[in-house]
Amino acid sequence: MRIANIPSDRRAVFAHNDPADLARCLEAVPEGVGRVIVIFDGIFSMRGDAAPLQDLLRVTAAHDHRFRDGVITMMDDSHGIGAYGATGRGTEEHAGARVDIFIGTFGKAFGVNGGFVAGSPTLIEAVRQKADTYIYTNPLGAADAAAAVAAINIADSDEGRARLAHLAARTLQFRAGLAALGLESIPGPHPVVPLLVRSTDTVRAMVQGLFERGILAVGLTFPVVPKGDETIRFQINAAHTEADIADALDALKALTQSPASR
């Protein structure tokens, strides 16, 4: 939004994952506007919650007729692609629905520099010819491109399916362990798992305590998240073992149930 330099009277922000608020925003678009673009995340990076894609698309479809070029949907699924959906194809696969413009990265599930924009041939040619953020930029290096292709081929193989199933099992193990400890999280199958701590000092102390026990987790405090939503973000990956997850849960038990933590 900042790079596009869209005037404030030509844009609106709808509430997080809220189809009703999206409908309100679309209803407020004045007559005469030729095109509306609705942009959202497939997986919200801070909390691992998924967009209600089918519900959002039902709203955009209901308003499509009002605009000459319709309502164009754009989804950034950087945290979904490779790690979410039955075969790792992300939020679209999980929801059984498609957006017009699909944005992703090779830097998360695939472990390589670079990213991509997917859409119709006409759209991609328009990006090549007209996108200020693309024109005169350097292409992806040959080594990164080859590594991305190799990673995608692994993900789209029997080995990749096995890794994805293992990732889902370890994610379920960790989420179930948090619940058993009485710790607050946000439900969902995604391997980004938030632990809602709701205290800056406690987040910092727990992140340090985890690090001292050989566990790397990211603390999120104000202004990255609103006050009262202080969180520790855990990222489960396909290399984690059942024992790794058990160790992390044991560390959390020690940190949250010791007298010093009360």
List each model region and its residues.
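Substrate-binding/gating loop at the entrance of the active-site cleft, primarily
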Residues: 1-7
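Active-site phosphate-binding strand-loop segment of PLP-dependent enzymes
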Residues: 9-74
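Pyridoxal 5′-phosphate
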Residues: 15-22, 36-38, 66-68, 78, ...
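Active-site PLP attachment segment
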Residues: 93-126
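Amphipathic alpha-helix from the class-I
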Residues: 145-162, 176-181
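Conserved PLP-binding catalytic core of the aspartate aminotransferase-like
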Residues: 163-172, 179-214, 224, 229, ...
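PLP-dependent enzyme catalytic core of the Aspartate aminotransferase-like
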Residues: 212-216, 224-262
